[in-house]
Amino acid sequence: MYCPFCRNPDSRVVDSRMADDGSAIRRRRQCPECGRRFTTVETTSLSVIKRSGVGEPFSRSKVINGVRKACQGRPVSEDDLAMLAQEVEEQIRASGAAEIDAHEVGLVILGPLQKLDEVAYLRFASVYQAFESLEDFEAAIAQLRHEAQEDAAERPATPRKPEKTSL
């Protein structure tokens, strides 16, 4: 690592810490030549391979922009979108792959988006999965209803509190 002050090609790591929820390493370095300290942030590269075969760095902002269109007019905040993009990136990085197809990124988006807003999920899925008919929408809605029923069945019933009666 070159020193940004004197351009010496060597430096010594003084301190290392995790940053950005573990997706990066922040290192404090010291130059043996001039003695000045500087900070570096190291992240692993994650490339998205587009349909054309061209690779580009993964971008949370592209995820947010794509999902924002599906969330238009819905009660979804910018913070919600940022959290969704972070969750998508974490899931992709957890796979351990340095490269991922753009199609796979879309599949990863569907899960967190479904939890965030079902209408936005349907909008995104309709474009992403190229819905061509009402039957496609009906099948997706039926799947959402089925999953909601399964979730409700898995949750334990909460005991009702006895009502107070006045004497």
Swiss-Prot record:
Keywords: ATP-binding, DNA-binding, Metal-binding, Nucleotide-binding, Repressor, Transcription, Transcription regulation, Zinc, Zinc-finger. Pfam families: ATP-cone (PF03477), Zn_ribbon_NrdR (PF22811). A zinc finger (unnamed) spans 3-34. Its cofactor is Zn(2+). Residues 46-136 form the ATP-cone domain. The keyword Cell cycle does not apply. PROSITE patterns: ATP_CONE. Residues 148-167 are annotated as: Disordered. One of its GO terms (molecular function) is zinc ion binding. GO terms for biological process: negative regulation of DNA-templated transcription. Binds 1 zinc ion. The keyword Glycoprotein does not apply. Belongs to the NrdR family. HAMAP family: NrdR (MF_00440). PANTHER family: TRANSCRIPTIONAL REPRESSOR NRDR. Negatively regulates transcription of bacterial ribonucleotide reductase nrd genes and operons by binding to NrdR-boxes. This is Transcriptional repressor NrdR. It comes from Pseudarthrobacter chlorophenolicus (strain ATCC 700700 / DSM 12829 / CIP 107037 / JCM 12360 / KCTC 9906 / NCIMB 13794 / A6). The lineage of its organism: Bacteria, Bacillati, Actinomycetota, Actinomycetes, Micrococcales.
